[in-house]
């Protein structure tokens, strides 16, 4: 292009009425001011959007307890639909997360030869098929338990089978071990392990199957409705030994006919002994992270509706079979007079009651079990009605090495976990103790 032609083009450009002004005749200064205003407004909008996004995705935000969770209950009159919606959000990373999750050292738990950064666990029943492990772990739990998983896929009991008692912050369920079965759940859990191992950036200090530093993954095993009461559990151990930090044997659901009969001392001792033998036979097969040996602890989950002699028998079965721990407890078939729910039909629905009203039963059973196991290495896990830091501390002082919850998480939202940890930390600091130092304190 010649110099003269370039000059003509340049002159034409600067004479263009629309190049620096939105309207004909607009002064250059006004155009610049308008552009600056638009830039400031745009930047502010982005910042406000980012702050709003951070607030919404931060589990500590009050909006989740007071708006999001009530809204979910409002749009899902059938509680099971609400359960499914919650899992969907957790599965696809849309649920709020505990930002900058760093646990106070006083919360550390040394258990099964491993470390948990905090003693708050998610109980089985929330993520039955291992679809949302990451979403749950990112709420701040130190332990995540999936299941119950049965060998074959089964639909469970007819619907409706899940009922809310909001005045009591409780639910009644009679799911009946609805499960996608061993193969599907195995594939779900293995898939995230493969993604972890294939990631370019990953934390090489992680040595737990939860795939998070100082967190553990438990897999809860059950039997099919018409399955063999021993073989079904052995198949579960064989299938999931390499994928679990902890294996849990569920013999206490009230919704599978005859299942609770397995809590009788003779039958339970035989069952647990065979499970431990199966676990031991697989130790040298290692785990999916490449460990040459792997020996996940075996825990049994029991009901809260047991007499002291029955609890003593379970303690004896646990000792004789050499399992590693007991989870106290599952749901209750009792309907205490303390329930605020006035709808007789609702509160007397068949199934297991969980949530706040279960706490007295679970705590009493835990204290009894601790009395008969305190001179052993058995690890006790408290579960039932825990919804605050004070609840967690009560269970610890009664003998629980760590605790689990589920129903309160559904009612209060993911921010509950941070709040419980904050409350426990504050109380421990006030007492000048650590979590490990208060375990069984009231029974000493």
UniProtKB/Swiss-Prot annotation:
<dbReference type="InterPro" id="IPR005719">
    <property type="entry name" value="Dihydroorotate_DH_2"/>
</dbReference>
<feature type="binding site">
    <location>
        <begin position="173"/>
        <end position="177"/>
    </location>
    <ligand>
        <name>substrate</name>
    </ligand>
</feature>
<dbReference type="GO" id="GO:0004152">
    <property type="term" value="F:dihydroorotate dehydrogenase activity"/>
</dbReference>
<feature type="binding site">
    <location>
        <begin position="406"/>
        <end position="407"/>
    </location>
    <ligand>
        <name>FMN</name>
    </ligand>
</feature>
<comment type="pathway">
    <text>Pyrimidine metabolism; UMP biosynthesis via de novo pathway; orotate from (S)-dihydroorotate (quinone route): step 1/1.</text>
</comment>
<dbReference type="InterPro" id="IPR001295">
    <property type="entry name" value="Dihydroorotate_DH_CS"/>
</dbReference>
<feature type="binding site">
    <location>
        <begin position="124"/>
        <end position="128"/>
    </location>
    <ligand>
        <name>FMN</name>
    </ligand>
</feature>
<feature type="binding site">
    <location>
        <begin position="250"/>
        <end position="255"/>
    </location>
    <ligand>
        <name>substrate</name>
    </ligand>
</feature>
<feature type="binding site">
    <location>
        <position position="220"/>
    </location>
    <ligand>
        <name>FMN</name>
    </ligand>
</feature>
<feature type="binding site">
    <location>
        <begin position="330"/>
        <end position="331"/>
    </location>
    <ligand>
        <name>substrate</name>
    </ligand>
</feature>
<keyword id="KW-0472">Membrane</keyword>
<keyword id="KW-1133">Transmembrane helix</keyword>
<protein>
    <recommendedName>
        <fullName>Dihydroorotate dehydrogenase (quinone), mitochondrial</fullName>
        <ecNumber>1.3.5.2</ecNumber>
    </recommendedName>
</protein>
<dbReference type="GO" id="GO:0106430">
    <property type="term" value="F:dihydroorotate dehydrogenase (quinone) activity"/>
</dbReference>
<dbReference type="GO" id="GO:0044205">
    <property type="term" value="P:'de novo' UMP biosynthetic process"/>
</dbReference>
<keyword id="KW-0560">Oxidoreductase</keyword>
<feature type="binding site">
    <location>
        <position position="148"/>
    </location>
    <ligand>
        <name>FMN</name>
    </ligand>
</feature>
<feature type="binding site">
    <location>
        <position position="301"/>
    </location>
    <ligand>
        <name>FMN</name>
    </ligand>
</feature>
<feature type="transmembrane region" description="Helical">
    <location>
        <begin position="34"/>
        <end position="56"/>
    </location>
</feature>
<dbReference type="InterPro" id="IPR050074">
    <property type="entry name" value="DHO_dehydrogenase"/>
</dbReference>
<dbReference type="InterPro" id="IPR013785">
    <property type="entry name" value="Aldolase_TIM"/>
</dbReference>
<keyword id="KW-0812">Transmembrane</keyword>
<keyword id="KW-0285">Flavoprotein</keyword>
<keyword id="KW-0496">Mitochondrion</keyword>
<keyword id="KW-0809">Transit peptide</keyword>
<dbReference type="GO" id="GO:0006207">
    <property type="term" value="P:'de novo' pyrimidine nucleobase biosynthetic process"/>
</dbReference>
<dbReference type="GO" id="GO:0009220">
    <property type="term" value="P:pyrimidine ribonucleotide biosynthetic process"/>
</dbReference>
<feature type="active site" description="Nucleophile">
    <location>
        <position position="253"/>
    </location>
</feature>
<feature type="binding site">
    <location>
        <position position="385"/>
    </location>
    <ligand>
        <name>FMN</name>
    </ligand>
</feature>
<feature type="binding site">
    <location>
        <position position="355"/>
    </location>
    <ligand>
        <name>FMN</name>
    </ligand>
</feature>
<comment type="similarity">
    <text>Belongs to the dihydroorotate dehydrogenase family. Type 2 subfamily.</text>
</comment>
<keyword id="KW-0665">Pyrimidine biosynthesis</keyword>
<feature type="binding site">
    <location>
        <position position="128"/>
    </location>
    <ligand>
        <name>substrate</name>
    </ligand>
</feature>
<comment type="function">
    <text>Catalyzes the conversion of dihydroorotate to orotate with quinone as electron acceptor.</text>
</comment>
<keyword id="KW-0288">FMN</keyword>
<dbReference type="InterPro" id="IPR005720">
    <property type="entry name" value="Dihydroorotate_DH_cat"/>
</dbReference>
<dbReference type="GO" id="GO:0005743">
    <property type="term" value="C:mitochondrial inner membrane"/>
</dbReference>
<dbReference type="Pfam" id="PF01180">
    <property type="entry name" value="DHO_dh"/>
</dbReference>
<keyword id="KW-0999">Mitochondrion inner membrane</keyword>
<feature type="binding site">
    <location>
        <position position="250"/>
    </location>
    <ligand>
        <name>FMN</name>
    </ligand>
</feature>
<feature type="binding site">
    <location>
        <position position="329"/>
    </location>
    <ligand>
        <name>FMN</name>
    </ligand>
</feature>
């Amino acid at each position: 292009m010649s110099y003269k032609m370039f000059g003509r083009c340049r002159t034409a450009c600067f004479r263009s009425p629309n190049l620096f002004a939105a309207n004909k005749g607009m002064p250059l200064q006004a155009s610049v001011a308008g552009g600056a205003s638009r830039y400031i407004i745009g930047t502010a909008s982005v910042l406000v959007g980012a702050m709003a996004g951070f607030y919404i995705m931060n589990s500590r935000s009050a909006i989740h307890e007071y708006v999001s969770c009530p809204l979910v209950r409002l749009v899902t009159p059938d509680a099971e639909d609400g359960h499914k919606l919650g899992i969907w959000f957790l599965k696809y990373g849309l649920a709020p997360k505990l930002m900058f999750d760093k646990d106070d050292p006083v919360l550390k738990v040394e258990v099964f030869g491993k470390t948990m950064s905090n003693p708050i666990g998610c109980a089985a029943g929330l993520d039955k098929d291992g679809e949302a492990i990451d979403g749950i772990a990112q709420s701040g739990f130190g332990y995540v338990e999936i299941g119950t998983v049965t060998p074959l896929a089964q639909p469970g009991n007819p619907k409706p089978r899940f009922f809310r008692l909001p005045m009591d912050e409780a639910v009644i369920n009679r799911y009946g071990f609805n499960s996608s079965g061993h193969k599907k759940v195995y594939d779900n859990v293995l898939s995230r392990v493969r993604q972890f191992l294939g990631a370019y950036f990953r934390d090489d200090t992680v040595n737990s199957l939860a795939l998070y530093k100082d967190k553990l993954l438990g897999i809860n095993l059950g039997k099919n409705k018409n399955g063999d009461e021993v073989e079904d559990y052995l198949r579960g151990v064989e299938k999931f030994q390499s994928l679990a930090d902890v294996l849990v044997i569920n013999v206490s659901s009230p919704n599978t006919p005859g299942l609770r009969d397995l809590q009788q001392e003779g039958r339970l001792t035989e069952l647990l002994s065979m499970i431990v033998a199966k676990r031991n036979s697989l130790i040298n097969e290692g785990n999916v992270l490449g460990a040459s040996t792997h020996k996940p602890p075996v825990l049994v989950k029991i009901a809260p509706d047991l007499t002291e002699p029955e609890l003593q028998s379970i303690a004896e079965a646990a000792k004789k079979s050499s399992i590693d721990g007991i989870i106290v407890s599952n749901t209750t078939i009792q309907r205490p007079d303390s329930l605020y729910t006035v709808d007789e039909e609702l509160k007397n629905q068949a199934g297991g009651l969980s949530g706040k009203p279960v706490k007295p039963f679970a705590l009493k059973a835990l204290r009894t079990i601790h009395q008969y196991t305190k001179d052993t290495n058995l690890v006790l896990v408290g579960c039932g009605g825990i919804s605050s830091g004070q609840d967690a501390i009560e269970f610890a002082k009664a003998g629980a090495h760590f605790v689990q919850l589920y129903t309160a998480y559904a009612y209060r939202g993911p921010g509950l976990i941070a709040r419980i940890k904050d409350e426990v930390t504050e109380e421990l600091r006030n007492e000048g103790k650590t979590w490990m130092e208060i375990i069984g304190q009231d029974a000493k």
